[in-house]
């Protein structure tokens, strides 16, 4: 896994190679101009914009935005091609997270994609939770396999037979492994790019400890990393909390999660999960160790994962009627430089200035590109890069060349500013930081505006119909949660618990559960979800 400094050096090297190629192109342009050749026709193509607005048809809007540069639909339903624009976002998050877990002494590994039925079915509660989603290989050529082989929906049962082999004594602990891989969950209802797909990329960490205290500590450390991915990189506000018994990981002791919320649809999204598995899997797979007193004990285990769902949440949160809006930290192109030639102005000088500007930014560690395509108008390029979501646009025209300045245009709010070339790098860095922070603050304000505190069933139903993120006092009983699901089941989906936030508001004595009328034990977020 390359570290950020290596990535920076790679970008600079690629930029220098690109500059050399662009010089050849410019020489051809200059030669054509001086020889009096007819200027190439500039395309004024239409159809760049989206056909629907985000607040009018969210589902169609989301599909159109994803299809621009993020994914391509595949000929198998629920499977998608991740194009370079989205894959780069995944790689940037991967670099951050991989470096952080290595600080925690987690090591990367890789386990096979295939699972034998005997192993998969060993942990009854676990497999019952995943059974409807498991895909099976049943043939080899035209012959039926004697024993069908499952494709991993998650890797607990794949990995843990070998944990029992590798762990013998207390000196073998903790064992901390992570793998970056794909998994398959054969979703049959409403596949959605990034959010619900049959195959997706993720990381899954699996750790074993001598004590529950160590496991508990790691659960929260990992959850904090997931919060940072969403809030610091994707500029998406999330709530950290505990899942209910009904919603926790099948076979686990407890599940923590970061939960996002999409105001346009009024739905929550489980952003990432960090589970304490307790000793249940250790019992099933006989993962024991000899402690310092020569006594045999079972290990305590965790598992934790985040996936390419993160990208879908980012698109839903920040995208607008022009297309994507990318936070600078995860944008593969943070700045695009566009020439704006005018009539008989010094076109070659403008092109040279664009190349020099992009190169200066790249040298400073900013991911920048110049768009020197001469068969598209500046206006067409503006729309194209706006749709791609590039955080900052720099325009250079004759007046900018004359005044030794550039014009910047922010993607998040459209604000334009003329800045001197002498302070270009410092100013652009500052702007990118402001864009990142503003995107987070705007998203947080929108989410907070959707939070509705309720105390009665009637208030709950009203808030649910108004697409609110509902915070309600709850008795913390599984049967009551199941009853809420049953009573709210409809065309838009049943309401359920999202999480009980770690940051609990005060619960006055005598507060009753909104659904059962029994004494409330905690505040819990409720809503419909993806």
Curated annotation (Swiss-Prot):
Coiled coil residues, start to end: none
Gene Ontology annotations of biological process type: prolyl-tRNA aminoacylation
The EC number(s) this enzyme carries: 6.1.1.15
Membrane-spanning ranges: none
CDD domains, per the entry: ProRS_anticodon_zinc, ProRS_core_arch_euk
PROSITE patterns in the record: AA_TRNA_LIGASE_II
Family according to the record: Belongs to the class-II aminoacyl-tRNA synthetase family.
Alphabetical list of PANTHER family matching this protein: BIFUNCTIONAL GLUTAMATE_PROLINE--TRNA LIGASE, PROLYL-TRNA SYNTHETASE
Protein name, as recorded: Proline--tRNA ligase, cytoplasmic
Organism, as annotated: Arabidopsis thaliana
């Amino acid at each position: 896994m390359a570290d950020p400094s290596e990535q920076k050096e790679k970008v600079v090297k690629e930029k220098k190679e690109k500059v050399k190629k662009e010089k050849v192109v410019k020489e051809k342009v200059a030669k054509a101009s001086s020889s009096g050749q007819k200027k190439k026709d500039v395309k004024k193509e239409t159809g760049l914009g989206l056909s629907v607005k985000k607040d009018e048809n969210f589902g169609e809007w989301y599909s159109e935005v994803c299809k621009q540069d993020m994914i391509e639909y595949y000929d198998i339903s629920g499977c998608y091609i991740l194009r370079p624009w989205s894959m780069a976002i995944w790689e940037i998050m991967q670099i951050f997270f991989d470096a952080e877990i290595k600080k925690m002494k987690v090591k990367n590994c890789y386990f096979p994609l295939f699972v034998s039925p005997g192993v998969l079915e060993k942990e009854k509660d676990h497999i019952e939770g995943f059974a409807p989603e498991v895909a099976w290989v049943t043939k080899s050529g035209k012959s039926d396999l004697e024993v069908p082989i499952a494709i991993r929906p998650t890797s607990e049962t794949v990995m843990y037979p070998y944990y029992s082999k590798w762990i013998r004594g207390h000196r073998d602990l903790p064992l901390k492994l992570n793998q970056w891989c794909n998994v398959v969950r054969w979703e049959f209802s409403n596949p959605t790019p990034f959010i619900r797909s049959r195959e997706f990329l993720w990381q899954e960490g699996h750790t074993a400890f001598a004590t529950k205290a160590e496991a508990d500590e790691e659960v929260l450390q990992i959850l904090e990393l997931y919060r940072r991915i969403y809030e610091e990189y994707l500029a998406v506000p999330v709530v950290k909390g505990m899942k209910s018994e009904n919603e926790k990981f099948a076979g686990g002791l407890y599940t923590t999660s970061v939960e996002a919320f999409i105001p346009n649809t009024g739905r929550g999204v489980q952003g990432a999960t960090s589970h304490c598995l307790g000793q249940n899997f250790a019992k099933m797979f006989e993962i024991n160790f000899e402690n310092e007193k020569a006594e045999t004990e079972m290990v305590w285990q965790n598992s934790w994962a985040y996936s390419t769902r993160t990208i879908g949440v980012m698109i839903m949160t920040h995208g607008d009627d022009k297309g994507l809006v990318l936070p600078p930290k995860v944008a593969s192109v943070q700045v695009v430089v566009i020439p704006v030639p005018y009539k008989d102005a010094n076109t070659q000088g403008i092109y040279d200035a664009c190349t020099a500007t992009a190169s200066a930014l790249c040298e400073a560690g900013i991911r920048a590109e110049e768009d020197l395509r001469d068969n598209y108008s500046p206006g067409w390029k503006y729309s194209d890069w706006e749709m791609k979501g590039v955080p900052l646009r720099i325009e250079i025209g004759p007046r900018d060349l004359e005044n030794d300045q550039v014009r910047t245009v922010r993607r998040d709010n459209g604000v334009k500013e003329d800045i001197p070339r002498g302070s270009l790098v410092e100013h652009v860095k500052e702007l990118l930081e402001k864009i990142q922070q503003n995107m987070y603050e705007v998203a947080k304000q929108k989410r907070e505006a959707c939070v509705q505190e309720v105390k009665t069933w009637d208030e709950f139903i009203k808030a649910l119909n108004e697409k609110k993120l509902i915070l309600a006092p709850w008795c913390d009983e599984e049967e009551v949660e199941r009853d809420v699901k049953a009573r709210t089941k409809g065309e838009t989906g049943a309401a359920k618990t999202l999480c009980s936030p770690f940051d609990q508001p005060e619960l006055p004595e005598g507060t009753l559960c909104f659904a059962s009328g029994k004494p409330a034990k905690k505040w819990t977020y409720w809503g419909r979800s993806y």
